[in-house]
Regions:
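N-terminal leader/linker segments that initiate helical-solenoid repeat arrays
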Residues: 19-66, 70, 78, 84
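Terminal, low-structured helical/coil segments at or just beyond the last alpha-helical repeat
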Residues: 31, 242-279
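Canonical positions in the second alpha-helix
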Residues: 41, 74-75, 111, 161-162, ...
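Short helix-capping/linker turns of helical repeat alpha-solenoids
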Residues: 47-48, 63-64, 77-81, 93-95, ...
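Hydrophobic face of amphipathic alpha-helices that form TPR/SEL1-like repeat modules
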Residues: 52-59, 86-93, 111, 135-144, ...
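TPR/TPR-like (Sel1-like) alpha-helical repeat modules
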Residues: 105-114, 222-242, 268-274
Length: 279
């Protein structure tokens, strides 16, 4: 019995030794008995709105439209207003995405709601002002088959805010048109001329053309033919292709009617304008 018991204890001891970690003769563990750690991949950290915006704009440059839109939407949903503005422009113009004025309107409205009080002297203020201008134009005409109906009074509020607070030249031009046409505002050509003037000084070609035509003809303002020709010439030289037709017509009509002295004086005014802008 003692022999059997001794054997049983020896077997159990051998089993325990086999299950225990192996040690070298110096007491250190041998490597072949140590389990290798399992590498568990970590989930990538989510992009910040700014990182997503940058990735989206870079994807646009690379031609990857799907990644671009997804990244911009992620940034926009997380409050990145430049992503909201970019998507608004894309939907308004049908660039990369299908044209959708209602989606564009919603993006622009989010910017206006959140950034109306931004400092007007910061570089990004022009994007906020542009959102107000876009909203003004949507309210002016409405969006077909949606709840956004034509509301000239609301359009004037949008243009007026961007024109006054942000001093935006496009807003000033559109506000002037409302006063000139009596749409959403009292018919007030003198007020229109004032806003055209503020916009024209900033280089807005449509305002330059309208102001030039009013001054040349003496339409509700004292006639200044040479000054009017100067503004028309500036407008003609800077007009984008989609505005060249009517601006060129105004310029050519005024040039046909102008006297030699008026043309000569307009040239003097134009030279002075260009020289002062270089300084």
């Amino acid at each position: 019995m003692r022999t059997v018991e001794t054997l049983r204890i020896a077997v159990i001891g051998a089993g325990l030794l086999a299950a225990a970690p192996a040690f070298a003769f110096d007491g250190s563990k041998t490597t072949d008995a140590v389990a290798s750690p399992v590498a568990v991949p970590l989930a990538p950290a989510p992009l910040s709105p700014t990182e997503a915006f940058r990735f989206g704009t870079q994807s646009l440059k690379n031609g990857d439209k799907v990644k671009a839109v997804h990244s911009l939407e992620y940034a926009a949903e997380n409050g990145h207003f430049l992503a909201q503005w970019k998507l608004g422009r894309m939907y308004a113009e049908g660039e990369v995405v299908a044209h959708d004025d209602l989606k564009a309107f919603e993006y622009f409205r989010r910017i206006a709601d959140s950034h109306a009080d931004d400092n007007p002297d910061t570089p990004q203020a022009r994007f906020v002002a542009n959102a107000f201008v876009a909203l003004g134009n949507y309210y002016l005409s409405g969006i077909a088959n949606t709840d956004i109906k034509a509301d000239p009074d609301r359009a004037r509020e949008m243009f007026s805010y961007a024109a006054s607070y942000f001093r935006d030249p496009d807003a000033q031009y559109y506000l002037a048109r409302l006063y000139l046409d009596g749409t959403g505002a009292p018919h007030d050509p003198r007020q229109a001329a004032r806003w055209f003037g503020l916009s024209a000084q900033k280089g807005q070609c449509q305002a330059q053309a309208m102001l030039g035509a009013m001054l040349f003809a003496g339409d509700h303002v004292p006639r200044q033919a040479a000054r009017g020709l100067m503004w028309l010439a500036l407008a003609k030289d800077s007009a984008p292709s989609d505005q060249q037709g009517w601006i060129n017509n105004l310029y050519e009509s005024a040039m046909r009617q102008a006297t030699e002295d008026e043309r000569a004086l307009a040239g003097v005014y134009l030279k002075h304008w260009l020289e002062t802008r270089k300084e």
